Amino acid sequence: MNLAWPSALLLLTAWAAQADDADKLRALGGGVFTKGGAVAEISLNRSRITDDQLKLVANFANLTDLSLEQTKIGDAGLANLTGLAKLEWLNLYRTQVGDVGLAHLAKLPRLQHLPIGETRVTDAGMAHIAKLKRLVYLGLRGNKIGDAAMAPLAKLPKLTGLHLGETRLTDKGTIQLTALGQLQKLWLHDTRLTDASVPQLAQLTQLKSLYLHRTRLSVEGVRLLQKSLPKCRIFYRSATVPE
């Protein structure tokens, strides 16, 4: 008996199961993309995927990119993703995910990009986010988070992009942001920031883009900030800083 046959049969069975799961995901309105013969990216944006059906995704061990934007996925669904050890990019924008679900994300060791704006996430969930030490981008736009969320986020050593637009952030919260000296892009538009935040923001010397439109900063305050950050393009009142 050829001992290689059982192994080959197992591989063939696993491949057939993945092919079947991929077909089911496509039937729900998703896109499944391969790289090097293995499924590496799945897009289910605006699809009919449910929490229970997300078990189909869990079978793709080589998955690096998963997008669930504008779906009904909630906390229970994220429990199905904890085995995706290679996942680097997870889009949860406009889903039903809340703080409980973030505890599941803390088990994804390679996660680097996490757009999770306009969800049910609050300040309480940031303690879980703080465990994702490889995060490069975090999008929290439109969530009910404020100054209390900043201390946990300040513990993310590789974060270069942070979206806090349309949140409850105030000048007090920017004090914690100074710990993120590696930030290159920062969205703070549609917040209650005033000129009192200028000294703190001026310490983020690696910034390349800063979005401050529809805040309470004055023209003079923004001009002063621009002088402190000459290499940063500041967007103010839907335009760049006035001359």
Put a short name on every predicted segment.
Residues G37-R223, S228-E243:
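Concave beta-strand-loop units of leucine-rich repeat
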Residues M1-S7:
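Bacterial N-terminal signal peptides that target proteins for export
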Residues L9-Q18:
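Hydrophobic h-region of N-terminal signal peptides that target proteins for export
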Residues S7-L9, L204:
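N-terminal hydrophobic alpha-helix used for membrane targeting or insertion
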Residues M1, A19-D20:
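Absolute protein N-terminus
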Residues L10, D23, A27, K227:
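Charged/polar, solvent-exposed surface patches and flexible loops
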Residues D20-G36:
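Short N-terminal segments immediately surrounding and downstream of signal-peptide cleavage
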